[in-house]
Amino acid sequence: MTLLSTFDLTYPIVQAPMAGATTPELAATVSNFGGLGSLGSGTTAPDVLNEHINTLKSLTNRPFMINLMVLSEHDSNTLDSPTPAWLTKYYQEQNIEMALPKRPALSFAEQLQVLYDNPVPVASFTFGIISAEQVQRLKDLGTRVIGTANHPLEAKAWAEIGVDAVCVQGVEAGGHRGGWLPQSANDPMGLLTLISQTRACTDIPLIAAGGIMTGQAIKAIQTAGAELAQIGTAFLTTDTCGINDIYKQALLDASQDKRSSETRLTRLFSGKQARGLLNDYLRDFGQFEDVHNLPPYPQLNAMTNDLRAHA
């Protein structure tokens, strides 16, 4: 059975679940047109997540996907790294007040419980791996399960616990990289290489993500061995996307002017590798990218939250 039939899709397109950018309206629109609409919910409180699921169910009778970020209770509850001096100084220079939360991230366990209590057609996971028991519990509720991998070893690990598919995310992808093994950060692979090497070690159905914007690119990933294309950036400037108009205009400008379209892979926003447009913040503080004491995710993410909100 192909993923098109497994997920009951008309088109081989998955709208990427970009936390902070996707909305129930965007996901429902994509699903209603025959793709797999997705809602990035890793930063969504459990009660709001439940409301979003109910909204999606009211807007579409087609399959849709909820994506969560896998974090241990310790990581989501620990904020013990000192704020870097350069970041504190930047807040002061910009006259922005930093208000650190009591915990740097929401409880993954509580978010996952929402998916048990209010089952969804498809659930995907990033930043880590769940257990085989959790996969089976979701599948017993009728939920299809997708893992995320930046390295073949991660894809193989997902396959071994019984998921329905794995989204392999090449280094070209915008936003956060979803892998968790050291190899995925130390040896970033281009998408076609990642598909090829993953295909050599597992026959799990693959969804490809990373720099896909055209039908020709979709053909290329299908030829390489993936079945569906997960596309994010192309949806960011749509009416139902949740980012503000300034960000949307920056993306539109970048599509017209190569001088403003340079991207960079960085840990400076969240502590975890993510690709974004090169801006003054990255230019000014790129020298701190590889310092050994850069706070990890999600701690640095909490430290830069007010800065990103101000921007």
Task: State what each model feature region is.
Residues M1-C201:
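Active-site entrance/lid segments in N-terminal catalytic domains of soluble metabolic enzymes
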Residues H176-I207, I212-A311:
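Conserved active-site-proximal phosphate/metal-binding subdomains
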